[in-house]
Amino acid sequence: MSSEPSDEHSSKQSDPVASPVARPIDCVLSSVQFLSRLPIPSSLANHNKPDFENGSWSFPLAGMVICLPALAIMIAAYLLGLNAEVIAVLTIITQALTTGALHEDGLADIADGFGGGANRERKLEIMKDSSVGAFGAVALVLSFLMRFVLLSSLLDLSFFTAIAGFIAAQVISRSVQVWFWQSLPAAREDGLSSAFGTPSKQSAQTALLIGGGSLLLPLIADVSIFSLAISITLIILFLVGFRKLCIDQIGGQTGDAIGAIQVLTEIAFLIGLLTFMP
């Protein structure tokens, strides 16, 4: 056997698209690597720029992987007999550490930019500033407070409902990210889309299908179909409203906006789950 494979064979080995089995795994690992601080073995890690035009469909699956450390903490805290409030705090802290507060950073930048900029250019300039202003601080506090109240309320109702709702929220919110990213033009030339491309329509549709499939988890946990309907309605309202706001304020999407919609969608979904609950 030759030690120097032909060009054709070499390209098939190096290109993850060439393997119908390896490609989905490669996409999920690339998304986990991009969206979190979870350690990926060097042999499995993607050392090249990820192809999110074709691979962003895996964001919701990555969301399921990313929430595993927080889920483990939630279960361990429950088995130790801790109350709902403590479990919720530990879960939220673990999730923020796992993601590096990536999406919360986007929410804070959006709040500062939209709240403090007088025009489009100034808003985009503020959003690139790494410091957190008053609007960003308020947005961060409110977002963490809302998730604490919502998760602890679900834990008070049912531990299994809280687990199902938490997992589904991580999956659905990241499927919405992909659709949001695909549906809007880039607001700046040096933004996320210029670096990684824009998700294809097929990627966005696949992500939404995966997100929709995660709704089975709350149903299995005896969440009312009416509660899920409210959750979906709230997600759509949040998505449509935030999408219009981004168009009006900066003319499209940025990485910060894509991060912010994840947090907003997660909150909207959890609010809906608590409706019609006994």
Model-identified regions with their sequence ranges:
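Glycine/small-residue-rich loop that forms an oxyanion/phosphate-binding "nest" at active or ligand-binding sites
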Residues: 105, 125
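Hydrophobic alpha-helical transmembrane segments
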Residues: 2-100, 114, 119-122, 129-253, ...
